[in-house]
Amino acid sequence: MKLIAASLRRLSLAVLTVLLVVSSFAVFTPSAAAETYTVKLGSDKGLLVFEPAKLTIKPGDTVEFLNNKVPPHNVVFDATLNPAKSADLAKSLSHKQLLMSPGQSTSTTFPADAPAGDYSFYCEPHRGAGMVGKITVAS
């Protein structure tokens, strides 16, 4: 009888240990981390462009806009050219203040509930020269 009780105790401890290990993986598995991407304002060759001009991200990701060449630059998201057609969303993503010096940066974090689709943006001083870009938020 003692032998059976001891065997059951060992079996119970083994099962409990396995359950504890398995459940700790479920609790401590990190969720998908948001990423940060960099978009240069002005090319390395001094062209009035965003580099890259097109970028694909996920909701919750951050885009850093780095003033590179030929300042001043800013980043304005077009209210009519975003999936939500929302002026408030475009305003919250935009940075209208001009970055005057190379190396200055500003960043935008896309909300976790940002609708999937294309978000068009431009540099106000250089829009006429073709300084426009597009960020695609993937679902």
UniProtKB/Swiss-Prot annotation:
Membrane topology of this protein: Peripheral membrane protein
Similarity remark: Belongs to the plastocyanin family.
Residues reported in the UniProt entry to bind Cu cation: H73, C123, H126, M131
GO terms, molecular function: copper ion binding; electron transfer activity
Domain (Plastocyanin-like): residue spans on this chain: 35-135
Keywords carried by this UniProt record: Copper, Electron transport, Membrane, Metal-binding, Signal, Thylakoid, Transport
HAMAP family listed in its UniProt record: Cytb6_f_plastocyanin (MF_00566)
PANTHER family, sorted: PLASTOCYANIN MAJOR ISOFORM, CHLOROPLASTIC-RELATED
Gene Ontology cellular-component annotations: plasma membrane-derived thylakoid membrane
Lineage: Bacteria, Bacillati, Cyanobacteriota, Cyanophyceae, Nostocales
Transmembrane segments: none
Localization, UniProt: Cellular thylakoid membrane
Signal peptide: 1-34
Function: Participates in electron transfer between P700 and the cytochrome b6-f complex in photosystem I.
Name of the molecule in the record: Plastocyanin
NCBIfam families linked to this entry: cyanin_plasto
This protein's record includes keyword GTP-binding: no
Pfam families linked to this entry: Copper-bind (PF00127)
Cofactor(s) the protein requires to work: Cu(2+)
